[in-house]
Amino acid sequence: MNIEGLAARDGLLFFGFRGPAKDERAPILSTKADELFKAEAPKADVTFIEVGKGRGIRALARVNDGILVLAGPDDDLANQDVGWILGLWDGKPADVAKLKYAAKPDLSAVKLRKCDDELKPEALAVLRDEPDAYDVIIMSDGMCDGGPLKFTLQRK
C-alpha cells in the first residue's frame, strides 16, 4: 500500500493510493479529519476512481468543486509507458467514480538536463480555480529542481 496523494476539503481528508490499483481503478480513502485523533477507529469511505489500465494516484489537490487527481504509472514496471492523466473527482463517496475533464498533460516538449534523472510527475498545486479552467503546476521526482510544469485543464 502506497499513499501518494493527500487533500483536505470540507472537514474531510482524502488519501490517494498508487497501489493497489485494480481493474483500471485506483482507491481514494476519505475520512473526517477530527476522527483521526479519537480513541476509536475512524469511519472511512473508499471510492475507486477510474484512472485507466496500469495507473495509480500520484497526487491530489483541493479545488472549489472537488478534488483534482493526477494519476500515472503504478508500481508495475510493465506499466511505465501508460502516461499521466489529470482530472476532477467531485469528492463524493461512491463505489466507483469517473474523472471529469480528464486530459493527458503533454510532456513531449520536456527536455532532460544533465542534472535530471527522469520525468516522473508526482506533485500537484493549483494556481487558478476559475469556472472555465484550472491552472496547475505539476512537479516531478527525478528532476533536479522538481521540474515545475504549468498546465491548464479546461472545463468543458
Where are these regions (language model features)?
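Sequence/structural signature of beta-propeller domains
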Residues: 1-156
